[in-house]
UniProtKB/Swiss-Prot annotation:
The keyword 4Fe-4S does not apply. Disulfide bonds join C1-C5. Keywords: Disulfide bond, Lipoprotein, Methylation, Myristate. The keyword Lipoprotein applies. The modification Cysteine methyl ester is found at C5. Occurs in 2 forms which differ in the post-translational modification of Cys-1. In form Eudistomide A cysteine is modified to N-(12-oxomyristoyl)cysteine while in form Eudistomide B cysteine is modified to N-[(12R)-12-hydroxymyristoyl]cysteine. This is Eudistomide. A lipid is attached at C1 (N-(12-oxomyristoyl)cysteine). A lipid is attached at C1 (N-[(12R)-12-hydroxymyristoyl]cysteine). Signal peptide: none annotated.
Length: 5
């Protein structure tokens, strides 16, 4: 899951 998960 860009940019963070």
């Amino acid at each position: 899951c860009p940019p963070l998960c």
